[in-house]
Structures are given as C-alpha cells and as structure tokens.
C-alpha cells in the first residue's frame, strides 16, 4: 500500500480506536459487521463486539462511524 493511503487510514482508525467510537464495517461481499476497533495494523482490523474478530483490510469496503469524528492528517514532507 502506498504511504499516502496509510497517512489517511492510520489517523482515522486510531481516532476511532482511542475514542471507542462504535463502527459499522461493510465488507466487499455486503456483510455488515458492528463493534469497536480494538487494534489494527497494515493488513487487519480487530473488531470487538461480543467477541473479537480479525477482519482483513482487503475484505473491507467501508468503515462507517456511529458519530462524526475529527482527526489530524500529517502531511509528509517531500
């Protein structure tokens, strides 16, 4: 994945994780998962509800927070 993609994903997912924002995650096959983001890395997101699920990022279509969130994106120096 390009560095630019990471500069958007990481702050967004980290804000959702730190603020315990409930999210709906839609997979590319249409399945909707709900919970809170427990952790994430380059390839997976750990989603906690009654159990913790490991969701591969390549299977995720959309992440929808239950409320509006604001986050800072650091622009890398070129």
From Swiss-Prot:
SUPFAM superfamilies: Sm-like ribonucleoproteins. One of its GO terms (molecular function) is RNA binding. The keyword Ribonucleoprotein does not apply. Pfam families: Hfq. InterPro entries: Hfq (IPR005001), LSM_dom_sf (IPR010920), Sm (IPR047575). GO terms for biological process: regulation of DNA-templated transcription; regulation of RNA stability; regulation of translation, ncRNA-mediated. GO terms for cellular component: cytosol. Residues 10-69 form the Sm domain. CDD domains: Hfq. Keywords: RNA-binding, Stress response. PANTHER family: RNA-BINDING PROTEIN HFQ. Belongs to the Hfq family. RNA chaperone that binds small regulatory RNA (sRNAs) and mRNAs to facilitate mRNA translational regulation in response to envelope stress, environmental stress and changes in metabolite concentrations. Also binds with high specificity to tRNAs. Homohexamer. NCBIfam families: Hfq, PRK00395.1. This is RNA-binding protein Hfq. It comes from Bordetella avium (strain 197N). The lineage of its organism: Bacteria, Pseudomonadati, Pseudomonadota, Betaproteobacteria, Burkholderiales. The gene is hfq.
């Amino acid at each position: 994945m390009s560095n630019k993609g990471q500069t958007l994903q990481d702050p967004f997912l980290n804000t959702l994780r730190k603020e315990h924002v409930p999210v709906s995650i839609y997979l590319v096959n249409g399945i909707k998962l709900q919970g809170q983001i427990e952790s994430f890395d380059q390839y997976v997101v750990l989603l906690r509800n009654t159990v913790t699920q490991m969701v591969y990022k390549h299977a995720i279509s959309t992440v929808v927070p239950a409320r509006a969130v604001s986050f800072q994106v650091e622009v890398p120096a070129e």
